Amino acid sequence: MCIRDSNTTQASARERIEAILDDNSFVEIGAGVKARATDFNMQEKDTPADGVITGYGVINGSLVYVYSQNPAVLGGSIGEMHAKKITGLYDMAMKMGAPVIGLIDCAGLRLQEATDALNGFGTIYRKMSLCSGLVPQITAVYGSCGGGLAVLSELSDFTFVEEKNGKLFVNSPNALDGNNDTKLDTASAAFQAEAGVSDFTGDEAVSYTHLT
């Protein structure tokens, strides 16, 4: 297990996976997948793994399935193939009866893919609902988890929000008339912990300890 110093910059999507799994145990699935959309010149954009790394490994010898969103690829936004990788991972986890860990750092819906991206949200909700009570579901929020994506935290059994960069919200703080995040940051880890939405908070290193 490799744990990055909390004083350094944020870990990458792959580093987060490596930090929670046993050394050299991660097997990636769907590394060659890219965005399928061609609208708005999307075919000209490089979209490695379509912004989400998926696969399986072990924690203390026990099998887990994990996905980690990559904000360096279209902000980690959810599109058609991005969602299919996540739901495919859930199918495998259900067959094996193994937990699913989601590491969230996402700009939200990929607007260029329109209804295909919206459908992707729905398929993820459905898979998580079907898995509820059958396999443990854990969500860790390291960056933005906003709009429709915020539902994932409520569909999970346990939710972690990183104390500095984690933002969990349906609407931004300024959606409240006269409010802004300097008055009351309703997206912050502290607010969500007090509201009972998240189960624990801390820096990234703390999250790795909880997740393992």
Regions found by a protein language model. Give the residues of each.
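A structural preference for short, pocket-lining loop segments at secondary-structure junctions
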Residues: 56-70, 85-112
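Glycine-rich, flexible beta-strand/loop modules in the N-terminal catalytic cores of phosphate-handling
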Residues: 69-77
